[in-house]
């Protein structure tokens, strides 16, 4: 079993039985998970900022860093591996977008990331079936390839599923 570990700005897809797609310490970042239950294809992107126009060079170098590039690329990769081209059957979830800067969330990055992801999913004709967003704590997220279950954990808060 070989898990796929994603860092900030990375996206990936797995069909490996018994494995997980995982990312650590989502603060204001947002993870979008996509799962195709019949084909058992699991994908995730770890988005840091809403729009690539903030830094076009970074967008070219690391497109998953931005919601407007990363979410469509994740979907494209899911389709490449056999998912329906219009997203039919995909189970989409989103997590993160926390306000982690105690008392100083001037830029509202978490909220802006959440809204950007929802807008992009809407443009793709999709929406999340479950969310665990906002609040003021970081999350570690694991998407199980065999089941599509999304486990969330946070130090001091325990573990849960969405």
Curated annotation (Swiss-Prot):
GO terms for biological process: chemotaxis. SUPFAM superfamilies: CNF1/YfiH-like putative cysteine hydrolases. Keywords: Chemotaxis, Hydrolase. Coiled coil: none annotated. The keyword Mitochondrion does not apply. One of its GO terms (molecular function) is protein-glutamine glutaminase activity. CDD domains: CheD. The keyword Hydrolase applies. It catalyses: L-glutaminyl-[protein] + H2O = L-glutamyl-[protein] + NH4(+). It is an enzyme of class 3 (hydrolase). Its EC number is 3.5.1.44. It holds the Pfam family CheD. InterPro entries: CheD-like_sf, Chemorcpt_Glu_NH3ase_CheD, Cytotoxic_necrot_fac-like_cat. Belongs to the CheD family. Probably deamidates glutamine residues to glutamate on methyl-accepting chemotaxis receptors (MCPs), playing an important role in chemotaxis. This is Probable chemoreceptor glutamine deamidase CheD.
